[in-house]
């Protein structure tokens, strides 16, 4: 499918470029294919970002011989020389086409950017207004990522009224009526619709038992992935707006010194970064699993208190410096008295330390999942990671770590590494074992038994019937085509593959692992749907919402929508002194689900503190 923000002119230019490449490929006898696998829908591709900026872009992909010569199954050969030649031909053919008509290509580029302004200026959703009251760090970070791409973002002051609402904490505003308006629309709109005729064809293919033709995700709205509250409207008040620069520091919220100590509200990824930086600097903090109120301010579950009595005299200046560098909120505490909730000597508070984290790496793990996870931990949260090769996991001294993470796998990592006994002992001794996506099924296998869940098969109308033995079977009459289809349906089939949608996950707010959340947006891909944990085995800390409220963005097959409802997103199961945490979908996919970074911190930072109680 094509992204609807690609213009007809751009598609015509792509065809023009392709036709000249085809002419040259024909001259050299080079076979090629187009349009069969890849799409032009998701904006994260190397050709889609320039396209949505007004360029004419496309991807050339050449099969690799994995060396100098590759023998195909049909007996023909693919050589390295051919690959080089084909890339040169396609590149020079592109240059030739544009050189013949360069003035009109430049004219088209200018027209694309002018029309983006005109189109947005007339739209009812011209302005995107992002609330700074919640997920402030994610909203501020998103604004800077947009500005770094040349998109203008403005800040409006606290108390201003926009889109008929008052923004007590202020807001960030993006006007789509700018040259990159189509890129803005693609990145920030809640959803980008698939062409109706394409959807109809995919549903028809599924009915015929064929695979769908979606290459990648159908959802990517950046505010939704970042957990940022936003709305769109036709008019806003920008009379007091201030433009944001890409290198502007995120404003910190720091005020005064505290005689008793300092509190860090556990509300977003920036707050987690501040706590982690403070722990890394050697300061001692305690986290609460129950909200408390001091001087009228509610500090949610997960919030951290750094008491002056537990720390050196540099506590105040250093925390202030870290909060300023990160752009976090730090509140001074004059005394330990609270109006509501637990006092700081309560068992609700757990002492924290800088977690020592190991990550399964290399053979058997998904390279992208392992890399995404390491990036989120090290670059987004500031937690060093020790990668452990799968081949040595069974021999590694896991007592050196507080947390072990198994990212998404291709299956068999635990068996391949012969690490089941090691992992069980690690958890029993107080460790936090975290698994993502397919790794959950490895820990749930009978051989490992660390998660009391199972993968589900697809829901089915098929009647398995009685076992039939011998060379013949009783006769059947099929009265309708539906009877026939039901009879041949594979009752052992897995759920339909989901290319990628954003769905709503509801939090069990009584559990420490849900600190900072009432709900979250999760990216769901693949076929894996798990059974919920029984209450006697553990907790379903996040479950997917009911079928009517499940889908946040993207296109989801109806069968999956019904089956995914109420199923677990995050599970926690205690064994001995430790805990096993299963994310049925990866929270670090592409390292762009910034709204889940706080949840990752819950598992990696709060988890060891809770297990040490």
Give the ranges of each region predicted by the language model.
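Intrinsic-disorder/low-complexity accessory segments
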Residues: 2-32, 36-42, 46-613
